[in-house]
């Protein structure tokens, strides 16, 4: 039996031993060393256990993988590591750190139970560190900390052992402050990163060494020894004495939970069904013999196998050929192949049980976040939808250069939308152009150049990037009458701003449209009251859509129940295009005050009720002091003090606002807020202004009101672009 086959057998055995499984991710700010760490953990584990292969074979195996150009970035890898005389199966997910790819991070968090948060020793805690930590804690994923690039503190900043420890303590304190602020109540203390018990490791992923306090006590290596090894350029020797993979994986096995432990508290957080039902209990217990329940966390497109769904199973088992049911798309599917991820390849296995991460082919209609179950035992409701910390803020129009490529382009766009639910794809009915909305310039570039151009082989014309605006209201409208085209049905409504706390709860993913579709559920009502809506109104919410809500304040109107679905559809159509520039409306509450309907049902059908509500909503919004909102980004610049003035000038020239400034040694950290519309070309400009000496990053920070003096000009530009008549 070859070493690969032995490894697969080892993984198959461990998959059934839940307390010896760790589903973990690596996440960090961009360029803090995630992928280097992932690659070296993989190399260190030899992708096979040491006792099976010996060092020589492990190296051969790794070189063979390297020759294939393996990069496990944003991919899933199963590997085996020995700790305390036992072997453990580690399912590792590496996540991207660039702000434009935050969606990948969110999806990965649903699959894992623990995360190694990587933080650069030189830069410290950065915006994306906070973002990925927030996403992890929201999904009840337990963190441990790896402080990377320690060699740079020694060789570049020449820190003494005392200064080194001081820098570590500062980073740990900042991370713990974030954990205390954002962790679930029951874990605020338990999940803090404690150096003494080994929840923190320090090292250099690039030079393949790491250390933790328990490892220092065991091995006798001190901070002074580490400085000596680095200064004398003997990091190779240090890597032999304190191998990166051993220290980081030991820490992960000791401190991160197995699926049996994690699912007890994670399932109630991501599934809102009946905890006492058979499937509810089975998921909490991670029962491999219970009803099937899993969630698709990523769609990977393979030229030969087609769409591959990476799936985390919480209950039951999937075998090749099993019939499956996709709850979100309400479709049946068949598991054509069931595999595990082994580096860049997939290895077929007969079945996968609860607590594991697997690769499934055959789920053609699946999207990231889809709930998978058995057609004979449908999981209702499905898992909570994945909520992202950012949303698409830039749109481009694309057209195939060659019209014969159009069907292929449509298929690729459908595939991209399934793979990445932070991308919006729409067709402009008037021009026939495809509109793609993404998280930023880089996100759009990757879609158009890489996914459509390189992978799809289609040449496209890409339009100028357009910023996505929103509309909202600042006042309350008078009572407005919405009249049906036949004049026999009248609905009376008021538009007013939604309570800020309720809108914030919606943005944070605490309110879901599903809870209000047929009739407000008790859970839905409780969430609204908790968010700050009056109890009397919470019972009467008819729909929540795109951050807007409609509340039925009428009494005793018999036909209203029959017309409910039509009223909701009219409301949705009414808030899709605001009165100023036909941009989406957000933060608006429509109160339905009264209604009169024709007694004959034939005269109150969809063609009558939907337009009546749509026109009423639009009219009410237009009379409630509508304003335009623009997307904002937090911009962080880390620059030598000599260039601080240039950095600030660059922000001020872009309608930016300086929020805070800090000095750290000879570096200045500028924290600011800048409109997305002013950020085009920022990368080149800031590099030029600071002669390439600065580090910078951005993060979506929500929508803000456009300054009053600029609103007419921007509204006119949008209306002209859309071919709408001037106001």
UniProtKB/Swiss-Prot annotation:
This is Elongation factor 2. Belongs to the TRAFAC class translation factor GTPase superfamily. Classic translation factor GTPase family. EF-G/EF-2 subfamily. NCBIfam families: aEF-2, small_GTP. Residues 19-260 form the tr-type G domain. Keywords: Cytoplasm, Elongation factor, GTP-binding, Nucleotide-binding, Protein biosynthesis. GO terms for cellular component: cytosol; ribonucleoprotein complex. Gene3D superfamilies: 3.30.230.10, 3.30.70.240, Elongation Factor G (Translational Gtpase), domain 3 (3.30.70.870), P-loop containing nucleotide triphosphate hydrolases (3.40.50.300), Translation factors (2.40.30.10). GTP binds at residues 28-35, 94-98, 148-151. It comes from the Archaea. It is found in: Cytoplasm. InterPro entries: EF-G-like_DII (IPR053905), EFG_II (IPR041095), EFG_III/V (IPR035647), EFG_V-like (IPR000640), G_TR_CS (IPR031157), P-loop_NTPase (IPR027417), Ribosomal_Su5_D2-typ_SF (IPR020568), Ribsml_uS5_D2-typ_fold_subgr (IPR014721). GO terms for molecular function: GTP binding; GTPase activity; translation elongation factor activity. The modification Diphthamide is found at residue 603. SMART domains: EFG_C, EFG_IV. The keyword Nucleotide-binding applies. HAMAP family: EF_G_EF_2_A.
């Amino acid at each position: 039996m070859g070493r690969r086959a032995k490894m697969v057998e080892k993984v198959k055995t461990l998959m059934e031993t839940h307390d010896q499984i760790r589903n973990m991710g690596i996440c960090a700010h961009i360029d803090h060393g995630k992928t280097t760490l992932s690659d070296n953990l993989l190399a260190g584990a030899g992708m096979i256990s040491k006792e099976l292969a010996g060092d020589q074979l492990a190296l051969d195996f790794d070189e063979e993988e390297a020759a294939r150009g393996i990069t496990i970035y944003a991919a899933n890898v199963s590997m085996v590591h020995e700790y305390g005389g036992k072997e453990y199966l580690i399912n590792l997910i590496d996540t991207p750190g660039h702000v434009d790819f935050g969606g990948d991070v969110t999806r990965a968090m649903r699959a894992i139970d623990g995360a190694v948060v990587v933080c650069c020793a030189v830069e410290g805690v950065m915006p994306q560190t906070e973002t990925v930590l927030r996403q992890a804690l929201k999904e009840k994923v337990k963190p441990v900390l790896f402080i990377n690039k320690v060699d740079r503190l020694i060789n570049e900043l020449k820190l003494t052992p005392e200064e080194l420890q001081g820098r570590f303590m500062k980073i740990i304190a900042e991370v713990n402050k974030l954990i205390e602020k954002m962790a679930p109540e029951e874990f605020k203390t338990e999940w803090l990163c404690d150096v003494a018990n080994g929840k923190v490791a320090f090292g250099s992923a690039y030079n393949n060494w790491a250390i933790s306090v328990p490892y220092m006590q065991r091995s006798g290596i001190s901070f002074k020894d580490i400085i000596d090894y680095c200064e004398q350029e003997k990091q190779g020797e240090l890597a032999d004495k304190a191998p990166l993979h051993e220290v980081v994986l030991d820490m992960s096995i000791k401190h991160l939970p197995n699926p049996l432990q994690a699912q007890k508290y994670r399932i109630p957080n991501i599934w809102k069904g009946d905890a006492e039902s058979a499937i509810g209990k089975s998921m909490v217990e991670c029962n491999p013999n219970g009803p099937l329940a899993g969630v698709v966390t990523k769609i990977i497109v393979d030229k030969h196998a087609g769409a591959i769904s990476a799936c985390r199973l919480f209950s039951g088992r999937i075998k090749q050929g099993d019939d499956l049911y996709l709850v979100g798309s309400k479709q049946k599917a068949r598991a054509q192949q069931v595999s595990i991820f082994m580096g860049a390849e997939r290895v077929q296995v007969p079945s996968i049980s609860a607590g594991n991460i697997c690769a499934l082919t055959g789920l053609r209609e699946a999207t990231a976040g889809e709930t998978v179950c058995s057609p004979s035992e449908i999981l209702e409701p499905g898992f909570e939808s994945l909520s992202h910390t950012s949303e698409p803020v830039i749109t481009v129009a694309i057209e195939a250069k060659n019209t014969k490529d159009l069907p292929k382009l449509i298929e690729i766009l459908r595939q991209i939308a399934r793979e990445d639910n932070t991308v919006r794809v729409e067709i402009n009915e008037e021009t026939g152009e495809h509109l793609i909305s993404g998280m930023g310039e880089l996100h759009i570039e990757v879609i158009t150049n890489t996914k459509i151009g390189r992978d799809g082989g289609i040449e496209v014309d890409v339009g100028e990037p357009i910023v996505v605006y929103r509309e909202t209201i600042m006042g309350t409208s008078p009572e407005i009458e919405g009249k049906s085209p036949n004049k026999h049905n009248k609905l009376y409504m008021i538009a007013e701003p939604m309570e800020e706390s309720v809108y914030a709860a919606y943005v944070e993913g605490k309110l879901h449209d599903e809870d209000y579709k047929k009739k407000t559920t008790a859970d839905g009502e409780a969430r609204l009251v908790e968010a700050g809506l009056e109890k009397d109104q919470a019972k009467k919410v008819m729909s929540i859509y795109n951050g807007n809500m409609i509340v039925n304040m009428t009494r005793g109107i018999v036909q209203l129940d029959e017309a409910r679905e039509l009223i909701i559809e009219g409301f949705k159509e009414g808030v899709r295009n605001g009165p100023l520039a036909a941009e989406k409306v957000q933060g608006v509450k429509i109160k339905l005050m009264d209604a009169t309907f024709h007694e004959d049902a034939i005269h109150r059908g969809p063609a009558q009720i939907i337009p009546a509500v749509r026109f009423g909503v639009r009219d009410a919004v237009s009379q409630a002091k509508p304003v335009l909102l623009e997307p904002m980004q937090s911009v962080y610049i880390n620059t030598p003090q000599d260039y601080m003035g240039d950095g600030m000038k660059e922000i001020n020239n872009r309608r930016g606002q300086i929020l805070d400034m800090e000095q750290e040694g000879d570096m200045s950290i500028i924290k600011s807020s800048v409109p997305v519309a002013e950020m085009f070309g920022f990368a080149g400009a800031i590099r030029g202004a600071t002669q390439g000496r600065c580090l910078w990053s951005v993060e979506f920070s929500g929508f803000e009101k456009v300054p009053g003096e600029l609103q007419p000009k921007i509204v006119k530009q949008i209306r002209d672009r859309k071919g709408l008549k001037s106001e």
